[in-house]
């Protein structure tokens, strides 16, 4: 028969205290959850990884002790000073002047004079004289032109060939206009030349032209006595081809 304390149900004091400590430690582990394993599982296992509770190292800094973003690329920056600020873009305002101002037109500030001459840009520049301004023709020159036109018209009238009724009508109209001017202006042979004496050329041409334009075409020099009556439509009256006067209709 065993007579040891364990057989009698009595445990030594040291053994009992160790058993109690083991039981207490196991209970604390069960209350905190599953016991942690020293072996790390893979990411595919789905278990939470043990994070190292080591000391977080501060971010590395360059050896110079200054962040590279704060260093100046231009060594002369401190000498020249800070850069000038960028000017603010002015607002142009509405496209139509005075729009959105409730009908109040403010005075526009006076512009500064430009570099060239210091003249106000609003000052009007003198316009050059017009070269095509109307000029008065001297009486002597007008008489000379009137003396040359009838002979030119007679030459043109003699060169007209074929059915050119409209051209003949225009020539006759010019001759009639010359006749009216001869009646209102003094004859060319009465006009003195620049030297103060009548010009013989003007006198001869005036006498010949007066003979050509007088009468009803019967005294035309170098032209046939027969009158040619022209018709160029209902709106144009019949005109004599030689003297330019309206002629009676023979039809």
Curated annotation (Swiss-Prot):
Main location: host cell
Organism of this sequence: Groundnut rosette virus (strain MC1)
CC per GO annotation: host cell cytoplasm; host cell nucleolus; ribonucleoprotein complex
Entry keyword Nucleotide-binding: no
S-S bonds: none
Oligomer and partners: Homooligomer. Interacts with host FIB2; this interaction, is required for ORF3 protein transiting through host Cajal body and nucleolus, relocalization of fibrillarin to the cytoplasm, and in presence of viral RNA, leads to the formation of stable RNPs.
Keyword Nucleotidyltransferase tagged: no
Compartment(s) of residence: Host cytoplasm; Host nucleus, Host nucleolus
UniProt entry keywords in alphabetical sequence: Host cytoplasm, Host nucleus, Host-virus interaction, Ribonucleoprotein, RNA-binding, Transport, Viral movement protein
GO biological process annotation, one example: transport of virus in host, cell to cell
Top-level taxon of origin: Viruses
Motif Nuclear export signal, residue range(s) on this chain: 149-153
Disordered: annotated segments: 25-134
Motif (Nuclear localization signal): 108-122
Function: Protects and provides long-distance movement to viral RNA. Self associates and binds viral RNA and fibrillarin to form filamentous ribonucleoproteins (RNPs) protected from RNase. ORF3 protein actually fulfills functions that are usually provided by capsid protein, which is absent from umbraviruses' genome.
Any GO molecular function: RNA binding
Name under which the protein is recorded: Long-distance movement protein
């Amino acid at each position: 028969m065993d007579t040891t304390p364990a057989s009698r149900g009595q445990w030594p004091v040291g053994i009992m205290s160790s058993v109690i400590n083991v039981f207490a430690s196991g209970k604390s582990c069960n209350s905190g959850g599953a016991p942690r394993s020293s072996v790390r599982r893979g990411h595919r296992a789905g278990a939470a990884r043990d994070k190292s509770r080591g000391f977080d190292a501060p971010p590395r800094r360059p050896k110079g002790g200054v962040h590279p973003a704060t260093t100046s690329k231009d060594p002369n920056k401190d000498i020249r000073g800070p850069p000038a600020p960028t000017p603010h873009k002015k607002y142009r305002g509405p496209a139509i002047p005075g729009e959105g101002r409730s009908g109040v037109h403010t005075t526009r500030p006076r512009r500064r004079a430009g570099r060239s001459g210091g003249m106000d840009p609003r000052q009007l520049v003198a316009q050059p004289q017009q070269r095509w301004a109307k000029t008065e023709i001297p009486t002597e020159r007008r008489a000379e032109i009137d003396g040359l036109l009838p002979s030119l018209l007679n030459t043109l009238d003699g060169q007209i060939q074929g059915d050119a009724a409209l051209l003949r009508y225009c020539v006759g109209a010019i001759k009639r206009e010359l006749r009216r001017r001869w009646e209102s202006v003094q004859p060319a042979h009465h006009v003195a030349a620049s030297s103060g004496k009548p010009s013989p050329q003007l006198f001869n041409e005036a006498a010949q032209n007066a003979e050509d334009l007088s009468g009803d075409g019967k005294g035309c020099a170098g032209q046939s006595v027969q009158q040619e009556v022209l018709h160029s439509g209902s709106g144009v009256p019949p005109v004599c081809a030689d003297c330019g006067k309206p002629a009676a209709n023979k039809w």
